[in-house]
A protein has these predicted regions:
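Basic, polar low-complexity surface loops/patches
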Residues: 1-180
Length: 180
């Protein structure tokens, strides 16, 4: 659990899919969110600070379908893989868990795999920036490589964003985005 918590600390805004053999497991709040959205069993593994640790998991061989559902629900997912095998672990002395690290982060706007994308629809990643009284808007479909940039007035932003229907919208933290 210590290794999981270290990895999770580096990716607090992502659901962490943590590889354990033939499964990806999720723990704590990530497990509660994933179990609810995916309709899978929420169980427990051990305890932390005297409380049960919520846990759920999905088979590695069928992970794409689960990832697609979480991405469509708007979640960011960090994939943590075993980066050494048991033989390598033995060569380094066999102490501690297998080495693991995040090898990929999936967000709704950066998915490129056909099996994770909605069929026959654009998957736009949209970014906003301000230049005096104008707004710069850039959009890219990562699966096709299409990329466009346009400058618009404030009053055109809502219409433009609605037309693009982005999978993900990125904007500066100090940007005052309207409540549409």
């Amino acid at each position: 659990m210590a290794q999981y918590l270290r990895v999770k600390e580096s990716h607090p805004d992502s659901l962490l899919f943590y590889r354990m053999g033939d499964f990806y497991e999720m723990f704590l709040k990530d497990a509660e969110i994933a179990a609810s959205l995916l309709g899978i069993t929420l169980t427990k593994r051990g305890s932390k600070d005297g409380l049960d640790v919520p846990m759920c998991g999905v088979p590695a061989h069928s992970v794409d379908g689960y990832l697609a559902r979480l991405i469509r629900a708007g979640h960011k997912v960090a994939i943590c893989e075993q980066i050494e095998d048991p033989q390598e672990q033995k060569q380094r002395g066999g102490k501690g868990p297998l080495k693991r690290d995040v090898v990929r982060i999936l967000t709704p706007g950066t998915v490129i795999e056909d099996e994770l994308l909605p069929a026959r629809a654009h998957n736009y990643l949209v970014a906003l920036g301000r230049a005096e009284s104008q707004i710069a808007i850039a959009w890219a479909d990562m699966s096709t490589g299409d990329f466009l940039v346009q400058e618009i007035a404030d009053e055109g932003l809502e219409t433009m964003v609605a037309r693009l229907d982005p999978a993900e919208l990125i904007y500066p933290h100090d940007y005052d985005l309207p409540d549409w």
